[in-house]
């Protein structure tokens, strides 16, 4: 949103793949960029903020989870309020990120990134989840009433120009100030520094979501087949109610959000050194 349109801005996006392959692709891409630059008498700067006053660079870690048959568990479908499997997976992700927001922050920490995070070019240094108006409304219904009877539909963008047709607007919308944003059928973790491997943040996301899945599976298996549907419903409502503090659809750059995040009890680490303590907590030791 802010300062995003700048001269000679370029982005390079490898094709989505499985975690280990995508991590290798990202490393090879960085090496290739440096080698090709030298070949043309240039230097590829992967530092997050090489020059003061000039926008730095980072990378978006696009994360989703699929079954062995190729089913994307983060695909909400046309009516996400009726998609119980999606809502359960979403609830587990919300729980995971809220429980281990400090570890996510640490996974994207380095000295160069400290100069970028929180500026108007990058997401804030405070981890929060952006779901978009459609899913935010579904979560609100579940928390307030225990069920979601409806979901918002995408609206239409009226251009006002006779030669340009009206365009359908995505119901999930976008928020460039969010560090962990839902974008249609995946999450984008936007805090990662341009010089870093995506191995650490992706492994962290995998680990914290796996823990949430394990806890949910234990609860649902203990409920038995007869009470399974009710147990799923109750678990979704419980997770979303207990961890809704991590959800934020507003301006992540604002000073008001920093104060609000502190009021909610979210971890606020100004820099890399501060975030290291996240690795020594009891919950982190149990996780790893």
Residue ranges and their predicted role:
Residues 1, 25-48, 53-55, 64-112:
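Catalytic or ion-translocation cores adjacent to nucleophile or general acid/base/metal-coordination motifs
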Residues 2-6:
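Short, small-residue-biased leader/transition segments that mark boundaries at the very start
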Residues 7-10, 27, 50-51, 57, ...:
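Acidic, glycine-enriched catalytic cores built around paired aspartates
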Residues 10-19, 63, 190-193:
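Short, hydrophobic beta-strand segments
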Residues 14, 75-76, 182:
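Generic structural "secondary-structure junction" signal
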Residues 16-22, 69-71, 78-80, 193-198:
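A generic structural motif
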């Amino acid at each position: 949103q802010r300062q995003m349109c700048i001269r000679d801005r370029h982005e390079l996006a490898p094709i989505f793949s499985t975690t280990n392959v995508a991590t290798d692709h990202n490393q090879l891409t960085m090496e290739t960029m440096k080698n090709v630059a030298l070949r043309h008498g240039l230097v590829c700067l992967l530092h997050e903020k090489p020059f003061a006053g000039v926008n730095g660079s980072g990378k978006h870690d696009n994360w989703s989870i699929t079954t062995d048959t190729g089913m994307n568990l983060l695909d909400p479908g046309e009516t996400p309020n009726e998609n119980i499997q999606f809502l359960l997976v979403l609830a587990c992700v919300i729980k995971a990120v809220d429980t281990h927001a400090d570890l996510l922050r640490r996974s994207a920490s380095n000295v160069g990134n400290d100069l970028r995070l929180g500026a108007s070019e990058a997401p804030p240094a405070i981890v929060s989840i952006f779901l978009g108006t459609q899913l935010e409304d579904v979560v609100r219904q579940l928390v307030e009433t225990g069920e979601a009877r409806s979901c918002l539909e995408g609206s239409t963008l009226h251009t006002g120009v006779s030669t340009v047709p009206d365009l359908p607007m995505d119901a999930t919308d976008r928020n460039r100030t969010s560090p962990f944003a839902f974008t249609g059928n995946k999450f984008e973790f936007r805090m990662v520094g341009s010089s870093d491997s995506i191995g650490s943040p992706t492994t962290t996301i995998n680990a914290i979501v796996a823990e949430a899945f394990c806890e949910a599976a234990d609860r649902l298996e203990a409920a038995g087949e007869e009470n399974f549907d009710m147990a799923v419903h109750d678990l979704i409502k419980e997770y979303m109610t207990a961890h809704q503090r991590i959800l934020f659809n507003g301006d992540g750059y604002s000073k008001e959000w920093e104060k609000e995040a502190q009021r909610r009890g979210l971890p606020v680490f100004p820099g890399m050194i501060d975030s290291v303590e996240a690795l020594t907590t009891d919950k982190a030791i149990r996780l790893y």
